[in-house]
Amino acid sequence: MILGIESSCDDSSVALLDIKNLKLLYHKKISQESEHSPFGGVVPELAARLHTRALPALLEEIKPKFKDIKAIAVTNEPGLSVSLIGGVSMAKALSVALNVPLIAVNHLVGHIYSLFLDCEARFPLGVLLVSGGHTMVLDIDAAGKISLLAGTSDDSFGESFDKVAKMMQLGYPGGAAVQNLAWQCKDKRRFKFTIPFLHDKRLEYSFSGLKNQVRLEIEKIKGQNLAGATDRELSNDDMADICYAFENAACEHIMDKLTKIFKERSFKRFGIVGGASANLNLRSRIERLCLENGCELLLAPLEFCSDNAAMIARAGREKYLKGGFVKHNELNINPRVKF
């Protein structure tokens, strides 16, 4: 079996995967959401401290199975440097203790393999990766080579939801909170936000402008003056109407570029991965797009959309079969590396 370790941001996770039949023998994740929620986002130093507490506890649970581990797959890129260090250090120490090889796994590649947790990978494949840190459309050829078709010039899809939620003091993470409020919208025509790059041929995403539009509307409702004083607070109806308009504009922005890409490329299969892929508005839109283009849609199970060690073990298994091991002194963290 392969041991997978994930600690790229604010989730500590460990998994055991059977190499031959891809059966997930163990998977557990300790989330830090409640600890970071008061701050409206991830506090790196706090995340690092929590990883040093959670990872040893998780590994202690599977200690009786250490003797069956053939390799250790660990996320080493990209992510928060202080978080990555925790997982990589743990993997190195355990690798020495168990005398098993190390496998370095790119976190984003791990998300791709969340589509194939219990089956062999099926390439070629188009992928939309949407998370708190990334927004990109990828093309993966038959050999598994990844090409970037579209990325973001500033905020990511998931990050914009988190920041809008922070403006309304909805806590962290903000994706589910914004989505739930959007469902409560009573006036769907009250707000209409401009969709970024709508008539631009560039295959590029940008969510900072959309986020700023939300901020301006909130300030307008509150009657906020230059000194920061406000006449009133947002009502639940205010927040619901704003969330509805924001979510639809954000999803429409994704779909605008994605539709252009579908016209240029004939995908036989297309997958949605990443924590923000759990957004039901976005999922339903992409389902329609794939149906209209005769394309098979692949979806990761909702519980494995966010960061998890199962996908890291699964991606590591591919490298294991090809002998893709890394020496201890060559396993470094790369916070900003993508592909």
Swiss-Prot record:
It comes from Campylobacter curvus (strain 525.92). One of its GO terms (biological process) is tRNA threonylcarbamoyladenosine modification. Gene3D superfamilies: 3.30.420.40. Fe cation binds at H107, H111, D307. Belongs to the KAE1 / TsaD family. This is tRNA N6-adenosine threonylcarbamoyltransferase. PROSITE patterns: GLYCOPROTEASE (PS01016). InterPro entries: ATPase_NBD, Gcp-like_dom, KAE1/TsaD, Peptidase_M22_CS, TsaD. It is found in: Cytoplasm. It is an enzyme of class 2 (transferase). NCBIfam families: gcp_kae1 (TIGR00329), T6A_TsaD_YgjD (TIGR03723). Required for the formation of a threonylcarbamoyl group on adenosine at position 37 (t(6)A37) in tRNAs that read codons beginning with adenine. Is involved in the transfer of the threonylcarbamoyl moiety of threonylcarbamoyl-AMP (TC-AMP) to the N6 group of A37, together with TsaE and TsaB. TsaD likely plays a direct catalytic role in this reaction. Substrate binds at L129, V130, S131, G132, G133, D162, G175, N279. PANTHER family: TRNA N6-ADENOSINE THREONYLCARBAMOYLTRANSFERASE, TRNA N6-ADENOSINE THREONYLCARBAMOYLTRANSFERASE, MITOCHONDRIAL. GO terms for cellular component: cytoplasm. The keyword Acyltransferase applies. It catalyses: L-threonylcarbamoyladenylate + adenosine(37) in tRNA = N(6)-L-threonylcarbamoyladenosine(37) in tRNA + AMP + H(+). Its EC number is 2.3.1.234. Its cofactor is Fe(2+). HAMAP family: TsaD. It holds the Pfam family TsaD. Binds 1 Fe(2+) ion per subunit. The keyword Transferase applies. GO terms for molecular function: iron ion binding; N(6)-L-threonylcarbamoyladenine synthase activity. Keywords: Acyltransferase, Cytoplasm, Iron, Metal-binding, Transferase, tRNA processing. The lineage of its organism: Bacteria, Pseudomonadati, Campylobacterota, Epsilonproteobacteria, Campylobacterales.
